[in-house]
């Protein structure tokens, strides 16, 4: 049984979050949580929270055994970018893009 959890509009760029997602794809959930705990990146904490949510969803909604679960799929899509202005010298301004992403984790007992 596949169970999904999503974090939409996460305040990290998709490029940075994909680095973390690649570390745990296909792993058992216990091993994935261990990897994320010791990964020194902001995105690791965000991905860990989504993974814990997916595990809880599988346990509560589907009655799955946590020991059998593995990360079947994990992907990070780009969300909308917030546009901000940074003043520069001589009356100019630069545009700053505050990027967001949508993190999706699918756990399965198969």
From Swiss-Prot:
Function, in words: This protein binds specifically to 23S rRNA; its binding is stimulated by other ribosomal proteins, e.g. L4, L17, and L20. It is important during the early stages of 50S assembly. It makes multiple contacts with different domains of the 23S rRNA in the assembled 50S subunit and ribosome.
InterPro entries found in the cross-reference section: Ribosomal_uL22, Ribosomal_uL22_bac/chlpt-type, Ribosomal_uL22_bac/org-type, Ribosomal_uL22_CS, Ribosomal_uL22_sf
GO cellular component: cytosolic large ribosomal subunit
Protein name per the record: Large ribosomal subunit protein uL22
Alphabetic keyword roster: Ribonucleoprotein, Ribosomal protein, RNA-binding, rRNA-binding
Family that this chain belongs to: Belongs to the universal ribosomal protein uL22 family.
Parts forming coiled coils: none
Organism of provenance: Actinobacillus pleuropneumoniae serotype 5b (strain L20)
Subunit structure: Part of the 50S ribosomal subunit.
Gene Ontology biological process: translation
Pfam families for the chain: Ribosomal_L22
GO terms assigned for molecular function: rRNA binding; structural constituent of ribosome
């Amino acid at each position: 049984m596949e169970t999904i959890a999503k974090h939409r509009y996460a305040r990290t760029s998709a490029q940075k979050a994909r680095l973390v997602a690649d570390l745990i794809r296909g792993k058992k959930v216990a091993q994935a949580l261990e990897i994320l705990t010791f990964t020194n990146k902001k995105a690791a904490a965000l991905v860990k929270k989504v993974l814990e949510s997916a595990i809880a969803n599988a346990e509560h909604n589907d009655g799955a055994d946590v020991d059998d679960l593995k990360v079947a799929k994990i992907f990070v899509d780009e969300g909308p970018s917030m546009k901000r202005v940074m003043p520069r010298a001589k009356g100019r301004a630069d545009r700053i893009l505050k990027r967001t992403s949508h993190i999706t984790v699918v756990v399965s007992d198969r």
